[in-house]
Amino acid sequence: MDPCECSKSGTCNCGGSCTCTNCSCTSCKKSCCPCCPSGCTKCASGCVCKGKTCDTSCCQ
């Protein structure tokens, strides 16, 4: 699992709207921000986004 620490790979802005910039990981744990492609619905807190697409298989 790629922890995708945005502080190392890009910039992470947390708040009402979470955004990751320059994040190139392919699978991300949602600790602060998800790194799924733009347009993806954010997973509930604690969920893990896998791969490059978000759908029903994204959250577990």
UniProtKB/Swiss-Prot annotation:
A divalent metal cation 6 binds at residues 36, 40, 43, 59. PANTHER family: METALLOTHIONEIN, METALLOTHIONEIN-1X. Belongs to the metallothionein superfamily. Type 1 family. It comes from the Eukaryota. Metallothioneins have a high content of cysteine residues that bind various heavy metals. The gene is mtb. PROSITE patterns: METALLOTHIONEIN_VRT (PS00203). GO terms for molecular function: metal ion binding. A divalent metal cation 5 binds at residues 33, 35-36, 49. A divalent metal cation 4 binds at residues 32-33, 43, 47. This is Metallothionein B.
